[in-house]
Regions:
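Short amphipathic alpha-helix that is part of the acyltransferase structural core
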Residues: 1-36, 53-54, 61, 165-178
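A generic "binding-loop/recognition-motif" signal
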Residues: 18, 74, 117-118
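Short, hinge-like loop/turn segments at secondary-structure boundaries
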Residues: 29-30, 130-132, 148
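A conserved beta-strand-loop-helix scaffold within acyl/acetyltransferase catalytic domains
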Residues: 34-50, 54-55, 63-83
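Glycine-biased flexible loop/turn sites that connect beta-strands or occur in inter-domain linkers
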Residues: 60-61, 122
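Conserved acetyl-CoA-binding loop-helix of GNAT-fold acetyltransferases
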Residues: 83, 89-102, 113-114
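Conserved active-site alpha-helix within GNAT-family acetyltransferase domains
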Residues: 106, 110, 116-144
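C-terminal "cap" of GNAT-fold acetyltransferases
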Residues: 135-178
């Protein structure tokens, strides 16, 4: 089953030329399990994205995307993970998230946050549901100054609640992994 993902998919950093394909993937799930993303937002954040590229045919095809966003000195967020329905269930999303987790470890981030409906998927990577806000009051006050929606979602601020209903806030503690 994962043979498909291993042999025909390359995980790599996104490039400017991938942004429209990332938008296509995000639009597949927008309004249901992902928040909509404007094209300009994707261009502004392309450096945070990684893609899964199908390499067994020409032209090569972007079949999944995901981003790692740094929220604080000890906290990152996995965001905007989308897998093309044609390859769902074949391990592509797992390979992509594994790559984002490895990148977070390389950056020295001890914790990773995700806001998701896909709790079983992320639980397989060690993410656990959280309640409250696992940061000190001083860090909370500093993070409140951010205009980033992901920070507001992590802090569970009231103004983002209408956009996050039904989602689960989950945390992976990389510093506790063996």
């Amino acid at each position: 089953m994962h043979d498909y993902a291993e042999n025909r998919i390359t995980i790599r950093r996104a490039r400017i030329g991938d942004v429209r394909e990332i938008k296509r993937l995000v639009d597949t799930y927008a309004g249901r399990v992902l928040l909509e993303k404007d094209l300009v937002t994707l261009y502004e954040n392309v450096q945070e994205f990684w893609v899964a590229e199908r390499t067994d045919r020409e032209p090569k095809d972007i079949v999944a995307c995901g981003a790692l966003h740094v929220l604080w000195e000890d906290l990152g967020e996995v965001r905007t993970v989308a897998v093309d329905p044609r390859v769902r269930g074949r391990g592509v999303g797992h390979r992509l998230v594994n790559g984002l987790v490895e990148l977070a470890a390389e950056l020295g981030l001890p914790k990773l946050f995700v806001l998701t409906f896909e709790t079983e998927f992320f639980a397989k990577h060690g993410f656990e549901p959280i309640t409250g806000t696992p940061v000190s009051p001083a860090v909370y006050a500093e993070m409140r100054r951010s205009a980033d929606k992901g920070v507001a979602e992590f802090l569970d601020l009231p103004y983002v609640k209408p956009n996050t209903l039904g989602n689960t806030r989950m945390l992976l503690r990389l510093d506790e992994r063996t």
